[in-house]
């Protein structure tokens, strides 16, 4: 159906209400109010905002590039040095978050490869699968059984237990 019709064939019926006269003796106050609002409020605010945006565009700060200096490990802290222990704990927490992000990235790569390759993912994604297993093993060795109240001290104790178990297994292998 066409959007417009032939006005010669189908004329519009005459309107029963009189057409409003656009010319009045009094001007419309709403137009004056909107112009006054634009000049008094909107224009200065827009001008200031554009100025601020230009200044921010010149001096853009990239927050994700913040680099923290490495602090000593908790094993290097003296026994009563609370500040050193606190800094080592915060460094360990940052390392923990970085390791979590690395795990997420490797997992996303493996999922993308599995999605892309379909049923043949074990053959075609062997490199990603091997990398994922290595990273997962290292992550689990370090952080798996720390519990909800994890800390650098608990992680260090877990690492010590793991090293003792490895030494014991190596001694038993050498003896056998």
UniProtKB/Swiss-Prot annotation:
Residue ranges for the region (Disordered) are 1-27
Q: Where in the cell is it found?
A: Mitochondrion inner membrane
- Pro residues biased stretches: 11-21
Q: Which UniProt keywords apply?
A: Electron transport, Membrane, Mitochondrion, Mitochondrion inner membrane, Phosphoprotein, Respiratory chain, Transport
One GO CC annotation, please?
A: mitochondrion
Tell me the membrane topology, using the record's own terms.
Peripheral membrane protein
* Annotated positions of the Phosphoserine modification: 21, 151
Q: Which domain of life is it from?
A: Eukaryota
Compositionally biased region (Basic and acidic residues): 1-10
Is GTP-binding found in the keyword set?
no
Q: What is its main location?
A: mitochondrion
Does the UniProt entry include the keyword Ribosomal protein?
no
Q: Which GO terms describe its biological process?
A: aerobic respiration; proton motive force-driven mitochondrial ATP synthesis
Q: Which PANTHER family match?
A: NADH DEHYDROGENASE [UBIQUINONE] 1 BETA SUBCOMPLEX SUBUNIT 10, NADH-UBIQUINONE OXIDOREDUCTASE PDSW SUBUNIT
Assembly information from the UniProt record = Complex I is composed of 45 different subunits. Interacts with CHCHD4.
The job of this chain, per UniProt, is described as:
Accessory subunit that is involved in the functional assembly of the mitochondrial respiratory chain complex I. Complex I has an NADH dehydrogenase activity with ubiquinone as an immediate electron acceptor and mediates the transfer of electrons from NADH to the respiratory chain.
Return the similarity comment.
Belongs to the complex I NDUFB10 subunit family.
Q: From the Swiss-Prot or TrEMBL record, give the protein name.
A: NADH dehydrogenase [ubiquinone] 1 beta subcomplex subunit 10
* Species per Swiss-Prot/TrEMBL record: Mus musculus (Mouse)
Give the lineage: Eukaryota, Metazoa, Chordata, Craniata, Vertebrata
- Gene that this polypeptide is encoded by: Ndufb10
């Amino acid at each position: 159906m066409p959007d417009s019709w032939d006005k010669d064939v189908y004329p519009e019926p005459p309107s029963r209400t009189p057409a409003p006269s656009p010319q009045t003796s009094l001007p419309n106050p709403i137009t004056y109010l909107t112009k006054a609002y634009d000049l008094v409020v909107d224009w200065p605010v827009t001008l200031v905002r554009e100025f601020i945006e230009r200044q921010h565009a010149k001096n853009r700060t990239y927050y994700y590039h913040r680099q923290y200096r490495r602090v000593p490990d908790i094993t290097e802290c003296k026994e009563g040095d609370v500040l050193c222990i606190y800094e080592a704990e915060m460094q360990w927490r940052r390392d923990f978050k970085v390791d979590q992000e690395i795990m997420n990235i490797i997992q996303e790569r493996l999922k993308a490869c599995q999605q892309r390759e379909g049923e043949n993912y074990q053959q075609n994604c062997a490199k990603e699968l091997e990398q994922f297993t290595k990273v997962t093993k290292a992550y689990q060795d370090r952080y798996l059984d720390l519990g909800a109240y994890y800390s650098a001290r608990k992680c260090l104790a877990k690492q010590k237990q793991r090293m003792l178990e490895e030494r014991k297994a190596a001694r038993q292998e050498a003896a056998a």
